[in-house]
Swiss-Prot record:
Name of this chain's protein: Small ribosomal subunit protein uS2
UniProt-listed Pfam families: Ribosomal_S2 (PF00318)
UniProt KW keywords: Ribonucleoprotein, Ribosomal protein
Gene name of the encoded protein: rps2
GO cellular component: small ribosomal subunit
HAMAP family: Ribosomal_uS2_A (MF_00291_A)
Length: 221
């Protein structure tokens, strides 16, 4: 595969790990999978990711930034998403999505977006649920193990890694602004700007019990 017509170089894509999936796959995501590695990890087709990313940015560019809501609850996506909002003007919800944000007019941060952009349909399930309820289009990054029912547009990618999510948000921001005629070939921000935000993310470690062993905390999925 050559770099020609790709949104960034193939080396950049591969170095970010956007193609590295999980050891699970669904029928929904099967068409985006290139191969399975000897260790059982499914590998996404970079060319298809590039194509879908380009189309997603073009679709989103039909909307004013204030009419788009981009959501993530993934730790490594929070910083890059905030940078995404800063560069594009798109509304972002980084962290917990408060129930009723889209469905309860009395909610403190009630919003009426025309399109939803998710980082993960499973982790961002509350936002997904409410977007379905009010009937707006839903664009989402999806990894190999995701179910895609109710999603209107899928961007197949590793949506868990710092480098991969940073690259996704950078490229979508760049293409969104280009498509809207706001920037030209000279881009006033870089992939590194987004990656820097991801690298600053801190993950809370499990608390130690009296014997010095991590306490297990079970969460509903």
């Amino acid at each position: 595969m050559s770099d020609e017509n790709l949104l960034t170089s193939l080396d950049t894509y591969l170095a970010s790990g956007i193609h590295i999936g999980t050891q699970q796959k669904t029928e929904d995501m099967k068409r985006f999978i290139y191969r399975v590695r000897s260790d059982g990890l499914y590998v996404l087709d970079v060319r298809k990711t590039d194509e879908r990313l380009r189309l997603a940015a073009k679709f989103l560019s039909n909307y004013e930034p204030q009419d788009i809501m981009a959501v993530t609850r993934r730790v490594y996506s929070v910083g890059p998403l905030k940078k995404f909002g800063e560069t594009t003007g798109i509304n972002t919800v980084a962290g917990r999505f408060v129930p009723g944000t889209l469905t309860n007019p009395a909610a403190k941060k009630f919003a009426e977006p025309e399109v939803m952009f998710l980082s993960d349909p499973r982790v961002d399930k509350q936002a997904l649920k409410e977007a379905i309820e009010i009937g707006i289009p839903i664009v989402s990054m999806c990894d190999t193990e995701h179910l895609t029912a109710h999603l209107d547009f899928i961007i197949p990618t590793n949506n868990k890694g710092r480098k991969s999510v940073s690259l996704m948000y950078f490229l979508i921001a760049r293409e969104y602004l280009k498509n809207r005629g706001i920037i030209g070939e000279e881009v006033p921000f870089s992939y590194d700007d987004f990656l820097e935000k991801a690298m600053g993310a801190k993950v809370k470690m499990p608390q130690q019990n009296q014997r010095g062993r991590p306490q297990r905390r079970f969460q509903r999925r």
